[in-house]
Amino acid sequence: MAATFQNYSGGTFASDLITVPNFTAYLMQEVYERSAFVQSGVITRNSALDASAGGVRTVVPGFIPPTPFEEQMQSNSTWGDSGAGYLTPRKITASAGTATLIHRGLSFAVDELSKQASGTDPMAAIMGYMSSIINKNRTATLLSHLKGVFGTALAANTVDVSAGTGGAEYITASAVIRAKSVLGERGEDLSVLAMHPNVYFYLESQGMLVFSTSAMAPGNSVNWSGGGIGVTDTKVAYFAGMRVIMDSQLPVTGTGAAAVYTSYLFGPGVVQEGVQQALETASDRNILSFQDVVSFRYSYGFHIMGSSWNAVGDNPTNLELADKTNFGLVWDRKLIPIVELKCKSPYS
């Protein structure tokens, strides 16, 4: 059905591009393949969070690791904690957090005059950028979620070295190890380090990054050091034994030499994703304005293990996700494998 009598404003063409069979599936696959947070294992799919039967939030059950215990056994009728000659059964405690779902969409429109004027196809260009656009939107949502969780609930999982001097205010192996120690023995579970480019390139300038090609099998990996000489665009950086993600959307507060950068240390699968409505694509043609329009929508939610969405409402904006009053914990904070690390960079 044609669009109603109106002009799609704000647009820049080629609705046939999205009628190609399986285009939407290809686009969603590309989104996941281009997501460093997905490829590194930080984000994992959890079908229990999908709420495919309907709903605005999901309950996320989980078990709290039991405290180790044992009893001395003897050859009499009074041994054990029971005092009656038998072992006392213990229980494992379950906890249930809540995850909220979000519904997002975006749309582009272009007219034939813009195509004629530019000599190119603006809609084709738009479609080429879509996976990058959706990925940036997802990253912005994830970082807002992290800001909210670390505001109060996980504040104790933060290490701030930005007040240091003489180089101590920059990211170092010592700072990263200190951040890992916040979780005690569970600090060894942290395997991915996400940082801003200004932090990343400082490490690279110091020769502190080690690179490995992502195309090699783990048992046959080839490593280079000294700034990544000879490394192709498939390079994967490691620092202090952790895989590095570089993203310019990582939080920065302040400017210039006073800028403070927030990095995150993640354990595998600590961010779980539910998908209530997979990416849906639709297109239309307005014959009165000679415009093509394409729209996208998706419904999903991120959940950080051990946390809980405590707000009354659902389908939050990124601003609401960043609100520290909307989150609580259902696990002890040391059981949640995420640590926040704040530092400065000489490349600000």
Where are these regions (language model features)?
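Sequence/fold signature of self-assembling virion shell proteins
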Residues: 2-40, 166-171, 205-348
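Long, contiguous amphipathic alpha-helices that act as assembly "spine/axial" helices in icosahedral shell
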Residues: 60-61, 91-154, 186-194, 279, ...
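Short, solvent-exposed loop/turn elements at domain surfaces
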Residues: 67-72, 202, 254, 304
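Extended, solvent-exposed, turn-rich assembly/linker loops in the middle of proteins
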Residues: 151-229
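Alpha-helical scaffold segments that mediate packing/assembly in large oligomeric complexes
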Residues: 110-185, 325-348
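A generic "binding-loop/recognition-motif" signal
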Residues: 24, 104, 199
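Assembly/oligomerization interface modules of large self-assembling protein complexes
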Residues: 33-104
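Short, well-ordered loop/turn elements at secondary-structure boundaries
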Residues: 55, 187-189, 238-240
